[in-house]
Amino acid sequence: MAIKPILFNTPMVRAVRSDIKTETRRLINPRYRDDEYSFQIITNAHTGEFVRVEMIDEWENCTRFLPPQYLPGDILWVRESWAVAADLPGISDGGFVYRSDYTDYELSQLKEKHFCWKPSIHLPKSAARTFIKVTGVWAERLQDITDEQCIREGIQKWSKDGKLYKYAPADGEGDYPMWPWQDTPIAPRGAFVKLWDSTVPKSKLPQCGFAANPWVWAYRFEQCGNPFTEKEVEE
């Protein structure tokens, strides 16, 4: 078992902490070619099994193994956008505060006061409060995702009248979809496509967007307790 960090944006931190999001997909190293002959899945996926993707390099005529960053049993501490509590207007207490705990309205109020949150990548280990345990790992093309798996990615079902249903992550208040109703997809897959592409820089959409159908590692996980001892946190 390894203990490693993992990044999530603010909406997904909320979904993880609410046990709504239990899967995440991460690009397999995009610097390698990924045509039909260069990537091959060579092991079946199930909890506890090492899963890898084989790449055949036609120029060097050799095989390279690209292991996933996380394996079943690993515990991941979530890096999220944060701040020192004393930096917030009107707060003098010590400790840390987290952007995902604030509603969209509260965040807009803080923005008007020119308050800046610290990037999640800079969250110190001692400030971590959310921990997840990897229970499954497998490799697949991004477009292989099912509707059920889209729901596991943090997509929720919404309706205004109990007749028409649409799908999206929750907004900052947790009571409405993230997107305007007219822009909210009517299927889980459409919502996942919209969510995925929103995280990809426009310049990389041709290679990494949903339409490009890149290879990804899919990780299934569940929340768990803090694995750190006091000594490990200090390190």
Task: Give names to the regions the model predicted.
Residues 1-235:
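Secondary-structure transition motif
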